[in-house]
């Protein structure tokens, strides 16, 4: 049979849900997927059908959602978030994934998005399509039985706690307001639409034979959602902690460490989380897992580089940047901003598009990528300036998976 790539009709969605159920271990059903569909633009999905007419089968699918991503400088960019990408096991190694990505990238570029983003199910797939890992997921597990806070850690006095134990569904408005403040100031922050708040709070309820009920710790400038692990009754897993201030972060952790019926508290956070340094024994906050988080593809190099902010301390400098399959540009950085224009001048620094995606939020250093020969320049001073200019003074974090 002949395969065809096109936009899906309503008749295709049952087949797409079947392919999702077979492809994604965390797929929880059509009802949740239908809610996420509200974030997909009119031309934001493609399918590959095997055959024609009513009997044709969906053997490939991909879509993008209309998202808003915070980047350094407290700038928020329209972002195309790729998701729901799958190829049937019966049709692998036929170029379907490449064809779907190429078509979606064409539509994303035509719609004017400066960047595209995704969460990768496998680490070796999306680099060849121009995506680079731009944030890092970092799991810390704390043995709370022996944890003690430094005397100079915030909130160490004898006054009453500023944190309350609450039920998540009863405090949605406060969570939304805190999250909105957080996501605008943190590179990697994403606007969370109402349908995703609906889903998050629905997941806080206990599921028969599944997850236990979630509880919340609420501070005026932060919150934490946690539940006891399904199989380990001495482990509390924090599913989300958002703090707008250092005081709120410490206050929430004081409350979590106070869960006396637990032995351990785990959280998936970011590599610069100050939690270990709040404790007198940093070893009690162990790194138990680490993985790439958000991946970025720079769709429009000048627009993306001119949109974000840069470190003021670097001073003004200029270079010529060549991005494989992306163009060659005169890049001038100064006073916290960049000017990026096409040029025919000889390149002084070269990289693939995925490398620029990894650099963009500031989580990864140009010098580190140069040491792996992923970024190439003969000018060591330029490399140091790029390190300093692209660095974010606010730690890069991962908002949520999509």
From Swiss-Prot:
Record note on quaternary structure: Homohexamer; trimer of dimers.
Protein family according to the UniProt entry: Belongs to the acetyltransferase Eis family.
Entry GO MF terms: aminoglycoside N-acetyltransferase activity; protein-lysine-acetyltransferase activity
Class of enzymatic activity (EC top level): transferase
EC code: 2.3.1.-
Protein encoded by which gene: eis
Catalyzed reaction equations: L-lysyl-[protein] + acetyl-CoA = N(6)-acetyl-L-lysyl-[protein] + CoA + H(+)
Domain spans labelled N-acetyltransferase: 3-154
Origin superkingdom: Bacteria
Coiled coil: none
One Gene Ontology biological process: aminoglycoside antibiotic catabolic process
Location(s) in or outside the cell: Secreted; Host cytoplasmic vesicle, Host phagosome; Extracellular vesicle, Bacterial extracellular vesicle; Host extracellular space
Location of the active site: 126, 402
Disulfide bonds: none
Record PANTHER family: N-ACETYLTRANSFERASE EIS
Sequence positions that bind acetyl-CoA: 85-87, 93-98, 121-122
NCBIfam families in the cross-refs: PRK01346.1-1 (NF002364), PRK01346.1-4 (NF002367)
Key words, A-Z: Acyltransferase, Host cytoplasmic vesicle, Secreted, Transferase
Protein name in the entry: N-acetyltransferase Eis
Species whose genome carries this gene: Mycobacterium bovis (strain ATCC BAA-935 / AF2122/97)
An annotated GO cellular component: bacterial extracellular vesicle
Nucleotidyltransferase in keyword set: no
Chief location: secreted
């Amino acid at each position: 049979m002949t395969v065809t790539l096109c936009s899906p009709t309503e008749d295709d969605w049952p087949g797409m849900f079947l392919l999702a159920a077979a492809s994604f271990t965390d797929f929880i059903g059509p009802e949740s997927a239908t809610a996420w569909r509200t974030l997909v633009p009119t031309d934001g999905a493609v399918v590959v059908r095997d055959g024609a007419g009513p009997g044709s089968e969906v053997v490939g699918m991909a879509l993008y959602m209309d998202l808003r991503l915070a980047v350094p400088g407290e700038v928020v960019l329209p972002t195309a978030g790729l998701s729901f990408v799958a190829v049937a096991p019966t049709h692998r190694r036929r170029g379907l994934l490449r064809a779907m990505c190429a078509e979606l990238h064409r539509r994303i570029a035509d719609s004017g998005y400066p960047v595209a983003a995704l969460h990768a199910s496998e680490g070796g797939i999306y680099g060849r399509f121009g995506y680079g890992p731009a944030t890092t997921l970092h799991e810390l597990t704390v043995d709370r039985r022996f944890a003690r806070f430094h005397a100079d850690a915030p909130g160490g006095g004898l006054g009453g706690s500023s944190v309350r134990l609450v039920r998540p569904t009863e405090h949605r408005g406060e969570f939304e307001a805190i999250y909105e403040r957080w996501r605008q100031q943190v590179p990697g922050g994403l606007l969370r639409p109402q349908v995703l708040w609906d889903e998050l709070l629905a997941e806080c309820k206990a599921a028969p034979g599944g997850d236990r009920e979630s509880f919340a710790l609420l501070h005026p400038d932060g919150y934490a959602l946690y539940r006891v692990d399904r199989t380990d009754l001495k482990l509390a897993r924090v599913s989300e902690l958002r703090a707008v201030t250092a005081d709120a972060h410490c206050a929430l952790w004081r409350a979590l460490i106070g869960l006396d019926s637990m032995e351990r508290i785990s959280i998936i956070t970011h590599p610069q989380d100050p939690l270990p340094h709040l404790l007198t024994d940093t070893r009690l906050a162990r790194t138990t897992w680490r993985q790439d988080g958000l991946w970025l593809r720079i769709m429009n190099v000048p627009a993306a580089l001119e949109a974000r902010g840069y470190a003021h301390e670097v001073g003004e400098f200029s270079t010529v940047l060549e991005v494989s399959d992306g163009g060659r540009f005169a890049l001038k950085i100064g006073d916290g901003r960049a000017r990026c224009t096409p040029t025919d001048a000889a390149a002084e620094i070269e990289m693939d598009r995925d490398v620029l995606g990894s650099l963009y939020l500031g989580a990864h250093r140009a010098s580190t990528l140069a040491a792996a020969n992923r970024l190439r320049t003969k000018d060591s001073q330029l490399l140091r300036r790029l390190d300093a200019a692209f660095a974010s003074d606010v730690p890069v974090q991962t908002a949520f998976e999509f």
